[in-house]
Regions:
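A short, basic/flexible loop-to-alpha-helix module at the beginning of a structural domain
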Residues: 127-141, 306-311
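Electropositive, gly/pro-rich neighborhoods at or near active sites that engage anionic ligands
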Residues: 2-125, 175-291, 455-458
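A short helix->loop->beta-strand "cap" motif at the edges of active sites that frequently abuts
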Residues: 166, 347-351, 390, 428
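C-terminal functional extensions of proteins
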Residues: 4, 15-38, 366-467
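An anion/phosphate-binding loop that grips the pyrophosphate of nucleotide cofactors and donors
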Residues: 317
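Short glycine/serine/threonine-rich phosphate/pyrophosphate-binding segments
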Residues: 152-158, 180, 329-336
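Charged helix-capping and loop-helix junction motifs
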Residues: 334-340, 368-372
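Acidic, Ser/Thr-rich low-complexity segments on the non-lumenal side of membrane proteins
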Residues: 138-165
Length: 467
């Protein structure tokens, strides 16, 4: 409001009438800001009131200790002061004036106190302390969300969800063996940090140099080309602390992460895929390059143990989201951890699967949403799991024709179609929404974080109303 007033004032060249009006609005804005600490939901007033009560109780305690003499003195002083004032001004005038003076002093004192705290705690932040307190209070009341997956899809979802809740847990696959993560995994013996780095950056509230630094990728330097600073940082912390989970916790504090990021397992997991033509492919990076339909995937060790923090997050979840992301290399690897699948099945929270916008050449050629769901069911069945892990599906309405779509089609990818009747006939409840990032603002066909998270939260609220 204040910025709009200032801009409007400048655009009229500082005319006297407009200047006066702007000053009036500015005064009203300042009063509103001063009173805003009284708004509900800040979890602040209760502690101020308790502090005030404590001071009063302490005063009475000291008075009793001193044989009540301070109270007598105080009462006598108040009566003397009131009597002296009312000799010159009637009570009908004196009372309201003194009352307003007291209220004004309280408001002014609290306002200046919060301003001082704001300058001390975050001198480089434009947002006012009360705005931050209100936003944090709102986020703390958000649902407890668990998002399971990996790759770009999961980090895209997290970027949007952090606007609705601070109680988010991302359970991330750790089977990557390509690129920077693969090199660090082979040479340092650490778990691949790439997907975890992306999720930490997505959940970071420190939208500044720190996040950019964490995502920075070296383009030159012997041994550094292709590595991101965040991958090196996480790998170094893992070597120092002894495990990736502790390294993530330390990194989360540095980046002011809203929520938590948890690896699906601490095991050194390697993926394999069995193709429909009988071939067997080793390694996550190789699976993404296959040109034959995948029958199923597995991993070494065969049944990796889940982290207790991942299981605890699922048990406490109010909403569980699977995907979006690469079907065989981002989503299903998490479901190779038996304890995670068991925890999902036991959870009473609504569980929703988000399908990709486009197929991936070689990996999901020709699959529509029904095909993706059947692939998940088949994978679980190969592990002896016949009970469904989700009953809700979120899919994109349609991918609009564009030169970008033509480019994808030329590379062997195509929009993932959604046959609502087929899915509903199988007992799934399907929701569709416009989830695609604007063509004019993106060089890729990806989910839009804001649209995706809005659709997820709309589903959650609808579910809560109906159940």
């Amino acid at each position: 409001v204040k910025d709009r007033i200032s801009r409007g004032h400048k655009s009229f060249g500082g005319r006297k009438s407009n200047s006066k009006r702007a000053n009036q609005f500015d005064l009203l804005w300042r009063i509103q800001r001063s009173l805003s600490w009284l708004l509900p939901g800040l979890v602040l007033k209760r502690w101020l009131i308790i502090s005030g009560i404590g001071l009063i109780v302490a005063f009475f305690g000291a008075s009793i200790w001193a044989d009540l003499r301070p109270i007598y003195w105080l009462v006598e002083g108040i009566f003397f002061l009131i009597g002296a004032i009312t000799k010159f001004l009637p009570r009908s005038i004196t009372g309201p004036l003194v009352f307003l003076l007291g209220i004004s002093l309280v408001i002014w004192g609290q306002s200046r106190s919060f301003t001082s705290i704001q300058k001390a705690v975050a001198p480089d932040k434009d947002a006012l302390l009360l705005d931050a307190l209100r936003a944090k209070s709102k986020l703390n009341r958000g649902p407890n969300i668990v998002a399971i997956g990996g790759g770009t899809g999961l980090s895209t979802l997290l970027k949007g969800l952090k606007k609705y809740s601070s109680r988010i847990t991302a359970i991330v696959t750790v089977a990557d063996d390509g690129g920077s993560s693969g090199i660090l995994r082979r040479e340092l013996g650490v778990q691949p940090p790439g997907d975890i780095r992306n999720c930490l950056a997505a959940l970071s509230t420190e939208e500044s140099l720190l996040t950019r630094l964490f995502q920075y990728r070296f383009s030159s330097g012997t041994g550094l080309v292709g590595h991101s600073f965040g991958n090196l940082f996480l790998s170094a912390l893992t070597s120092i602390t002894g495990n990736l989970e502790t390294a993530i916790t330390a990194s989360s504090r540095v980046l002011a992460v809203q929520g938590q990021v948890v690896p699906a397992t601490n095991a050194d997991v390697s993926l394999w895929a069995e193709l429909e033509n009988g071939d067997r492919i080793e390694g996550e990076s190789a699976i993404g390059k296959v040109r034959s339909p995948i029958a199923r995937i597995g991993c070494y060790p065969e049944y990796p143990a889940a982290l207790p923090s991942a299981i605890e997050a699922i048990e406490n979840a109010e909403l569980i989201v699977l995907g979006p992301g690469s079907l065989y290399t981002s989503l299903l690897p998490n479901l190779l951890v038996p304890q995670i699948v068991e925890a999902i099945q036991k959870s009473k929270a609504p569980k929703i699967y988000i399908c990709n916008l486009m197929t991936q050449p070689g990996e999901t050629d020709g699959l529509d949403v029904t095909g993706h769901v059947r692939a998940i069911e088949a994978q679980l069945a190969s592990l002896g799991i016949t009970r469904r892990i989700f009953n809700f599906i979120l899919a994109h309405e349609s991918v609009a024709p564009s030169p970008l779509l033509d480019y994808y089609l030329s590379r062997g990818a195509e929009p993932v179609q959604c046959d609502l009747n087929s899915l509903r006939a199988q007992g799934y409840k399907v929701f569709t929404a416009s989830l695609q990032k604007g063509i004019s603002t993106s060089a890729t066909l990806r989910h839009d974080p804001a649209r995706l998270s809005r659709a997820v939260m709309h589903f959650y609220r609808k579910y809560k109303r109906e159940n």
